[in-house]
Swiss-Prot record:
Belongs to the NmrA-type oxidoreductase family. PANTHER family: NMRA-LIKE FAMILY PROTEIN, NMRA-LIKE FAMILY PROTEIN (AFU_ORTHOLOGUE AFUA_6G00280). The keyword Oxidoreductase applies. Fusarium verticillioides possesses 2 unlinked loci, FDB1 and FDB2, necessary for detoxification of antimicrobial compounds produced by maize, including 2-benzoxazolinone (BOA). The FDB2 cluster arose as a duplication of the FDB1 cluster with rearrangement and expansion by incorporating additional genes. It comes from Gibberella moniliformis (strain M3125 / FGSC 7600) (Maize ear and stalk rot fungus). Its EC number is 1.-.-.-. NmrA-like family domain-containing oxidoreductase; part of the Fusarium detoxification of benzoxazolinone cluster 1 (FDB1) involved in the degradation of benzoxazolinones produced by the host plant. Maize, wheat, and rye produce the 2 benzoxazinone phytoanticipins 2,4-dihy-droxy-7-methoxy-1,4-benzoxazin-3-one (DIMBOA) and 2,4-dihydroxy-1,4-benzoxazin-3-one (DIBOA) that, due to their inherent instability once released, spontaneously degrade to the more stable corresponding benzoxazolinones, 6-methoxy-2-benzoxazolinone (MBOA) and 2-benzoxazolinone (BOA), respectively. This is NmrA-like family domain-containing oxidoreductase FVEG_08287.
Length: 303
């Protein structure tokens, strides 16, 4: 089933998945391709050229195409592949993921990994503060309503690096603040892209019965108090002050139109954003993952 694999996009996650697929011991004769805009493939910019050369060095073929194309144009490309993995999520216009799923169905692709590397949208449910979540739930309905394309959704939680984004605010290295969202006991699952790539590649080449279902992986699952404790352990107690952004505070941020306020509110509720590591694919398969304590070893204070 995985003889001809197309990954959509070569951003942080796409590159991590491509590298893991290329290096997987069960790759055998599987052909790997990555969908990139022709302008990216033919770019003379040093960084772009370096990236293309790196991917080609791993035996990955650039496939010209653009996810902004029409459904039928995308289907014409997808028709040549057995497995498609969508890593085109961040910053894409509303409706892009629905169009990609429709193109996959139209092309008759055998297996699809949609861009759902994040929260468990079934658990969050419709009507949240984030409209894009409703689109993801509707895509799940589409997948479940058909039987021609096998699908797998890999729920990963938040990218671990997002904890350190200033707008998200959980670990602010510049202000030396750790924050809880909702309550200090609310939990969050976080995973680094490299580990997402490794586990996804393992599912692609060795599914072990995983099909037409949502699976979970986790680098770490912690409460915000546990996150703050690990930050203190790394940088010394008293270096960071603690601040709680409860639901009332986050609702004010939402009303003020603050950046990523919808996401913070979702994580503060704690539904569909955290799961026990014991029930994850990585634990079942004995795949070692990067936890927050280990990740923090490479994090330094902003001077």
């Amino acid at each position: 089933m995985s003889d001809n694999i197309l990954v959509l996009g070569a951003g942080e996650l796409g590159t991590a998945i491509l590298e893991a697929l290329a290096k997987h011991p069960s790759r055998a004769n599987a052909k790997l391709s990555v969908l990139l805009r022709p302008s990216s493939i033919n770019s003379t910019a040093p960084e772009k050229k370096k990236q293309i050369e790196h991917l080609q060095g791993l035996g990955i073929t650039p496939q010209p195409g653009d996810v902004e194309s029409s459904t039928s144009e995308l289907a014409a490309i997808f028709r040549n592949y057995d497995t498609i993995i969508s890593c085109n999520g961040m910053g894409r216009p509303f409706g892009t993921q629905t169009k990609l799923a429709d193109a996959v169905f139209e092309a008759g692709v055998k297996r699809y990994f949609p861009w759902q590397f994040g929260m468990d949208y079934d658990a969050i449910g419709t009507g949240s503060d984030q409209d894009r979540f409703d689109e993801q739930i509707n895509i799940r309905k589409k997948l479940r309503a058909q039987n021609k394309t096998e699908w797998t959704i890999v729920s990963t939680g938040l990218f671990m690096s997002f904890l350190f984004l200033t707008d998200f605010g959980v670990i602010n290295l510049e202000q030396k603040v750790t924050r809880g969202l909702g309550t200090w006991d609310t939990k969050i699952t976080v995973t680094v892209p490299r580990d997402i790539g490794r586990v996804t590649a393992d599912i692609v080449f060795d599914p072990r019965g995983i099909a037409n279902e949502v699976v979970h992986i986790a680098g770490d699952t912690l409460s915000y108090k546990e996150i703050a404790d690990l930050v203190d352990e790394r940088f010394g107690e008293g270096t960071f002050r603690r601040e709680l952004w409860d639901m009332e505070t986050l609702k004010k941020q939402l009303a003020e139109g603050r950046p990523v306020a919808e996401y913070k509110a979702t994580f503060a509720v704690g539904k569909g954003v955290a799961w026990d590591r014991e029930g994850t694919v990585n634990m079942a398969r004995g795949i070692q993952m990067t936890g927050l304590r280990e990740y923090l070893k490479d994090v330094n204070l902003v001077k």
